[in-house]
């Protein structure tokens, strides 16, 4: 198994040997660096903390800067932690993780933050059918309807679907195939769509 951090570049199409168009997502994957090695003795579990997308020192908070300097790596915008068993090889602080750890045909799961849609009603957010257009209704077309009876249950249940902020959720899509690996450009081409807008950060992990 393998894992890496990346940034979504955008979508494109590739053609297979049967001249069929395959929708693909291009991801800038790595290079990442190990910023911390967590051990069972010290932290209670074994994991690697890796970082991606370098940033200037004057843009980095002092505590974070000290954390990066301790590992001998440059400050980065994105940090994530992965369990040690995900990686096939033993890693040390400062080691580089490249996109070449993947190969064509690998099955991966991609995690990211979905696009934010802002405040949305129940029709857009949860695909409610809305109220009747006839029988005297005037302003109930996109209304949620009843959210709890008066005599029973005399309350609104927790988790009731209502209007609110849509999107900006942590999303993982599993079962995606690696179509192409371009180590010289640090690019990973994956079949299908992945969460989030362009230039958003992603976690790519090979499936078992």
Curated annotation (Swiss-Prot):
Q: Which GO terms describe its molecular function?
A: rRNA binding; structural constituent of ribosome
Q: Which domain of life is it from?
A: Bacteria
GO terms under cellular component: cytosolic large ribosomal subunit
User: Which SUPFAM superfamilies does the annotation name?
Assistant: Translation proteins (SSF50447)
Q: Which UniProt keywords apply?
A: Ribonucleoprotein, Ribosomal protein, RNA-binding, rRNA-binding
Entry-linked InterPro entries = Ribosomal_uL3, Ribosomal_uL3_bac/org-type, Transl_B-barrel_sf
What does the record note on quaternary structure? Part of the 50S ribosomal subunit. Forms a cluster with proteins L14 and L19.
> What family does this belong to?
Belongs to the universal ribosomal protein uL3 family.
Annotated protein name in UniProt: Large ribosomal subunit protein uL3
Query: Which species is this record about?
Result: Chloroherpeton thalassium (strain ATCC 35110 / GB-78)
Lineage summary: Bacteria, Pseudomonadati, Chlorobiota, Chlorobiia, Chlorobiales
């Amino acid at each position: 198994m393998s894992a890496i951090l990346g940034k979504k570049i955008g979508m494109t199409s590739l053609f297979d040997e049967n001249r069929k168009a395959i929708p693909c997502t291009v991801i800038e994957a790595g290079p990442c660096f190990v910023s911390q090695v967590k051990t069972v003795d010290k932290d209670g579990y074994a994991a690697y903390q890796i970082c991606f997308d370098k940033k200037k020192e004057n843009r980095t908070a002092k505590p974070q800067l000290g954390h990066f300097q301790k590992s001998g790596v440059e400050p980065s915008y994105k940090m994530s932690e992965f369990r040690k068993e995900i990686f096939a090889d033993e890693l040390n602080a400062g080691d580089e993780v490249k996109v070449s750890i993947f190969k064509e045909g690998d099955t991966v799961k991609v995690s990211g933050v979905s696009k934010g849609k802002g405040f949305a009603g129940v029709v857009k957010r949860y695909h409610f059918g809305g109220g009747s257009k006839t029988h005297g209704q005037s302003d109930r077309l996109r209304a949620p309807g009843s959210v709890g009876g008066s005599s029973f249950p005399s309350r609104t249940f927790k988790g009731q679907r209502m209007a609110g902020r849509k999107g900006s959720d942590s999303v993982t899509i599993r079962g995606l195939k690696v179509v192409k690996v371009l180590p010289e450009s640090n690019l990973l081409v994956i079949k299908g769509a992945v969460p989030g807008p362009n230039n958003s950060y992603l976690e790519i992990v090979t499936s078992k």
